[in-house]
């Protein structure tokens, strides 16, 4: 059975000896669309296909990196490397095990609806007043938050970044689009909003925003302690279309993301079977 907690409540807790494998897999994730989707999908696979118990924990990325490096969490499936999360990797990378890339070509940047008459970051000052001089961002611990502050400086933008959360940011985007109003947000692909709205990532001629791969990282000793789970993670890859399909299904549903992920797993069983280690 999946348990969901906040990280502050469980730091320092030991691994529980329960379930078929007498082990609980502890996965930490941020409140980001792709992280929610991938983490709940892996929880479904581990529990329903492989017999493990899973404990899910939400936290900011800096807290997650610290907890995984310290061994308080087993896995983090949403590490944007080598660029967006570079400061965290510089601090904790030597203590983490790399379990491969789930998807490549992970794009970050400033995003606007296609009805807006700007195509590049260096054009934003021309509509700064229409935007109330604001860029709608996410949490201050996110790599894209730091990159956006750098973009404001590099492009000398007459804008300030307003921190919020992934859900709050997409809610603001949806409200603006419904009213055909101008808005600029910090965005990334893959994300369900690109499947729902007509959006464009603004050109970045100064190259402030990097392209990354989304990696899975584990605590020290994880591959030795849980080799079957480590092999699952090494095998786990998704196309942008597959991940977008899962993210949209979760966002469209009032059900728990874990239940939606389970339904997606059953509808894509051949794909899931290709990830599961076979003896």
PLM features per residue range, with description:
Residues 78-91, 175-200:
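A ligand-binding cleft/hinge motif common to bilobed small-molecule-binding domains
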Residues 1-21:
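Gram-negative bacterial Sec-dependent N-terminal signal peptides
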Residues 240-279:
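C-terminal functional modules
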Residues 42-51, 128-161, 266:
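Ligand-binding cleft/hinge of the Venus flytrap
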Residues 32-33, 55-67, 161-172:
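Short helix-initiation/N-cap motifs at beta->coil->alpha
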Residues 107-117, 212-225:
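A bilobed periplasmic-binding-protein/Venus flytrap-type ligand-binding module shared by bacterial periplasmic
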Residues 94-141:
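A conserved helix-loop-strand patch within extracytoplasmic ligand-binding domains
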Residues 24-40, 60-61:
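Extracytoplasmic "Venus flytrap"
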């Amino acid at each position: 059975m999946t348990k969901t907690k906040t990280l502050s409540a469980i730091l320092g807790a030991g691994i529980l000896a329960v379930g078929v494998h007498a082990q609980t897999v502890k996965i930490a994730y941020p409140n980001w669309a792709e992280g929610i989707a991938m983490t709940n999908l892996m929880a479904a696979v581990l529990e329903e296909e492989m017999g493990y118990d899973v404990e899910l924990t939400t936290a900011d990325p800096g807290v997650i990196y610290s907890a995984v490096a310290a061994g308080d969490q087993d896995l983090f499936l949403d590490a944007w490397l080598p660029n967006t999360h570079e400061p965290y990797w510089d601090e904790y990378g030597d203590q983490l095990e790399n379990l491969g890339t789930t998807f490549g070509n992970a794009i970050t940047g400033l995003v606007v609806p296609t009805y807006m008459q700007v195509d590049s970051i260096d054009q934003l000052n021309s509509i700064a007043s229409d935007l109330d001089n604001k860029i709608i961002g996410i949490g201050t611990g996110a790599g894209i938050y730091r990159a956006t502050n750098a973009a404001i400086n590099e492009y000398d933008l007459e804008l300030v970044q307003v921190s919020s959360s992934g859900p709050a940011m997409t809610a603001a985007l949806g409200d603006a689009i419904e009213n055909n109003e101008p808005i600029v947000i910090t965005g990334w692909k893959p994300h369900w909003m690109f499947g729902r709205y007509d959006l464009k990532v603004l050109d970045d001629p100064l190259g402030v925003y990097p392209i990354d791969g989304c990696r899975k990282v584990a605590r020290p000793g994880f591959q030795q302690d849980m080799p079957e789970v480590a092999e699952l993670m090494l095998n786990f890859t998704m196309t942008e279309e597959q991940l977008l399909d899962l993210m949209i299904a979760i966002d469209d549903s009032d059900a728990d993301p874990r239940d939606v992920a389970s339904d997606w797993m059953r509808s894509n069983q051949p794909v899931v079977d290709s990830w599961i280690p076979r003896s």
